[in-house]
């Protein structure tokens, strides 16, 4: 990864602290992975606080496949199975069945409807019956252990939400360029500066978590 581009947002630990601060303000963060992996940046928001305006930004600026990152325990509570029994995707992205709130939505595809679905799903008292299947929100299962187990955007999103004091649930969507191609780090940095967003890498998160574990040992 081109560290020189990320350096304008501080050191790895400073980038993590800045991302946590922005999330606590209810703002979005761009989470990037290694250029030898997906080499993509995901716009992420806390599931608890995402607004219709923020969702509209995700739909407008990103790929359109809005995902809700959840823990295994939460997915068991919602009785959401994996989309396929044999996951053959290159990066083992763990999609479940897609969902829609049963109440409070129309077609389910608008920004407001997707926020309603997300708020419904992450509520502590949400029951499986509160969600229709399929729908326009795509849950993802985060592996236990977070980015120290899998260097994925899903795990990074859940880890960041925990670090910011939220429920371990976040919303993500992959940033794209105007021509529909995937945004790479230079474009991600430009987008972040234009919209006053912070950028943090999955490797930054792993470093912060490993450092915390060493201090706690």
UniProtKB/Swiss-Prot annotation:
Which positions does UniProt annotate for D-ribulose 5-phosphate binding? 37-38, 42, 150-154, 174
Q: Look up the coiled coil feature and give its residue ranges.
A: none
Protein's name according to its UniProt entry: 3,4-dihydroxy-2-butanone 4-phosphate synthase
Q: Where does Mg(2+) 1 bind?
A: 38
HAMAP family in the cross-refs: RibB
Gene name in the database record: ribB
- Stated family: Belongs to the DHBP synthase family.
Report the GO terms under cellular component.
Answer: cytosol
One of the GO biological process terms: riboflavin biosynthetic process
């Amino acid at each position: 990864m081109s560290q020189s581009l990320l350096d304008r947002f501080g050191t790895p630990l400073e980038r993590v602290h800045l991302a946590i601060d922005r999330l606590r303000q209810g703002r979005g963060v761009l989470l990037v992975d290694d250029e030898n992996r997906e080499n993509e940046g995901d716009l992420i928001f806390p599931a608890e606080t995402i607004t219709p305006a923020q969702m509209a930004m995700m739909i407008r600026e990103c790929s359109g496949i809005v995902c809700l990152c959840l823990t295994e325990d939460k997915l068991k509570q919602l009785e959401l199975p994996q989309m396929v029994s044999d996951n053959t995707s290159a990066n083992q992205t763990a999609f479940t069945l897609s969902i829609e709130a049963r109440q409070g939505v129309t077609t389910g595809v608008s920004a407001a409807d997707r926020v309603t679905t997300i708020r419904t799903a992450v509520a502590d008292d949400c029951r499986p019956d509160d969600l229709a299947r399929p729908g326009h929100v795509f849950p993802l299962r985060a592996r236990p252990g977070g980015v120290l187990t899998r260097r994925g955007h899903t795990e990074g999103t859940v880890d960041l939400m925990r670090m910011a004091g939220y429920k371990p649930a976040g919303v993500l969507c992959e940033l794209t360029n105007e021509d529909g191609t995937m945004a790479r780090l230079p474009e991600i940095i430009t987008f972040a500066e234009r919209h006053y967003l912070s950028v943090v890498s999955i490797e930054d998160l792993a470093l912060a978590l490993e450092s915390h574990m060493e201090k706690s040992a």
